Regions:
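Non-catalytic, mostly N-terminal accessory regions of nucleic-acid modification and defense proteins
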Residues: 1-168, 232, 236-247, 350-353, ...
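Short, contiguous acidic/charged loop-to-helix segments that flank catalytic cores in large enzymes
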Residues: 3, 270-298, 323-331, 352-358, ...
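Conserved Class I SAM-dependent methyltransferase catalytic core
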Residues: 29, 216-221, 293-368
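Hydrophobic alpha-helical scaffolding
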Residues: 121, 213-219, 258, 293-297, ...
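Conserved S-adenosyl-L-methionine
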Residues: 146-261, 265-279, 289-291, 301, ...
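A generic structural signal for well-ordered coil/turn residues at beta-strand boundaries
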Residues: 207, 255, 259, 361-362, ...
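Short, surface-exposed amphipathic charged segments that create phosphate/polyanion-binding patches used
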Residues: 256-257, 361-367, 398-403
Length: 497
């Protein structure tokens, strides 16, 4: 992050501490910053040399508020939020249901003045984006806010984009887009002159037609819209690039070239989904997804099926999934077999611990290419990069960086992934990059993709065992997976009675 961006983040975030004493959470504060920065930017755009129509009604602009103090400021801010919530497009989506949560008027005044001092429009989109991303990260670092679940490590996002290598005038979806991190990384990749020299129509497509997102949580949805707008994605009056809602409820109808996503971690969905061939118990609340391969209450498994639906026949996906997706029985096994049959599930990246804000998370990235319908099995081999064994990061003292993922990207060989070379061999058993034939995988119990071969040195070192929370998380995950497998077996036995 640049020094300018870092200084602004520190100043703006410094005002949050006294607000905490008034019961204002980091998330609430960030939401208020979203509203205020948007108002200030809109005011700047309405003036020379831009003179842009902002859509904000007269009497409800930044300049109608920024000189006020005390109760007058509070009342005017409240009136602006209520009025703009009734507007259309991105404007209305950002301000819908907005209320002032900074009841301390002296701090509200200080925040307004701090934002007023900066010329946001004259900043490059990189600087604006850095500032907002910095604020999002501050929010994610707050354990109590729970916002870390929406925050995928940026080095991982960039590596996933680098491997997929999205092309101009192609569409990209994220069905649980959080604050929009995958979209911003894809935009940066596409706009980088080292990758492509975009012409005018390609730039316009990148801004208005490339991205399709869905986000369930209202506050996060608003943060995402603001984040995209600050990075020049979307338009005040054009198509809103992100919809609010549960992506799993139905087939959205669109088909895209790429999916980049990190579905929310968590074992169960509150709704059981069924495909066209499965029966349900009467008490279940059911959404009939005829496009799904099988029924599951596991959110990650449902997202994989949803991603398969929204991909074009030649589409490509990179998806972060927890370990249980790779080894769980029942629906998990059915979905793994379907992926191997109907897509080219060519790569798995085993992720290290300590990179997510939720402690003890063990995750992977699966890369698969959809294929047109064919009687032949589409996956011939699966390449696995073990970036977990004997690797550990922490969020503060030893965070994962872009450089840490360069070896994986080189092994992946994005320019032509069919020209790959294993680093593992009988002579080099410590190699992290290894190929497995699909026949080897199909012979494994439950078609498990949870494959590792490196010796875990921490298990041999009793003084360097994993942290207790990691061990506890492992035990809980294994017990939950076993319980779900037994539950599915019991349900199947009931149906057969």
């Amino acid at each position: 992050m640049s020094e300018q961006s870092s200084n602004i983040v520190s100043k703006v975030w410094g005002l949050c501490n006294p607000l905490r004493d008034d019961g204002v959470s980091y998330g609430d504060y960030l939401e208020q910053l979203t509203y205020l920065i948007f108002l200030k930017m809109s005011d700047e755009y309405s003036r020379p040399p831009y003179k842009r129509e902002t859509g904000i009604p007269k009497g409800y602009t930044w300049s109608d508020m920024n000189t006020l103090k005390g109760a007058e400021l509070e009342n005017q801010y409240r009136a602006i939020l209520e009025r703009l919530g009734d507007e259309g497009g991105i404007l209305g989506q950002i301000f819908k249901g907005a209320v002032n949560k900074i009841s301390n008027v002296s701090i509200l005044y200080r925040v307004v003045q701090m934002i007023d001092k900066e010329n946001w429009v004259s900043m490059s989109s990189d600087v604006k984006g850095e500032i907002y991303e910095g604020l999002l990260q501050k929010n994610a670092e707050d354990v109590k806010s729970g916002a870390g679940q929406y925050f995928t490590p940026r080095p991982l996002i960039k590596a996933m984009v680098a491997c997929l290598r999205p092309e101009p005038k192609k569409t990209i979806a994220d069905p649980c887009c959080g604050s929009g991190g995958f979209f911003l990384a894809a935009q940066a990749f596409l706009a980088n002159p080292k990758n492509y020299a975009l012409d005018r129509t390609e730039k316009e497509f990148l801004k208005n037609e490339t991205f399709y997102g869905t986000e369930l949580v209202v506050a996060t949805f608003k943060l995402c819209l603001m984040n995209l707008y600050l990075h020049n994605i979307g338009d005040l009056y054009g198509k809103v690039p992100v919809m609010r809602g549960d992506a799993l409820l139905s087939d959205p109808g669109y088909r895209v070239d790429y999916v980049l996503t990190n579905p929310p971690f968590g074992k169960k969905s509150s709704i059981t989904f069924t495909n066209e061939e499965e029966e349900q118990e009467e008490e279940d609340l059911v959404y009939n997804r005829q496009d799904f391969w099988t029924t599951s209450s596991n959110k990650q498994l449902n997202f994989i099926q949803h991603i398969n639906t929204i991909l074009k026949p030649t589409g490509k996906a990179a998806v972060v999934v927890p370990d249980n997706v790779l080894f769980e029985g029942g629906s998990g096994e059915i979905i793994r077999k379907k992926l191997l049959e109907t897509t080219d599930l060519h790569t798995i990246l085993r992720l290290p611990t300590g990179i997510f804000y939720k402690p003890g998370v063990k995750a992977n990235v699966i890369f698969f290419d959809k294929r047109p319908a064919s009687p032949e099995r589409q996956t011939k081999e699966v390449w696995i990069y073990d970036f977990r064994t004997n690797v550990h990061f922490t969020l503060r003292q030893h965070p994962m960086t872009d450089a840490d993922l360069q070896d994986f990207i080189q092994c992946y060989h994005p320019e032509n992934r069919h020209e790959r070379t294993e680093t593992w061999s009988q002579e080099n058993p410590e190699g992290r990059w290894r190929r497995f034939s699909v026949e080897e995988i199909l012979e494994r119990d439950k078609t498990s993709l949870d494959i590792f071969w490196l010796k875990d040195k921490s298990l041999a070192d009793l003084d360097n065992l994993p942290e207790p929370d990691e061990l506890a998380a492992d035990i809980i995950e294994n017990l939950q997976s076993a319980l779900e497998s037994f539950q599915e077996l019991m349900n199947q036995l009931k149906k057969n009675d």
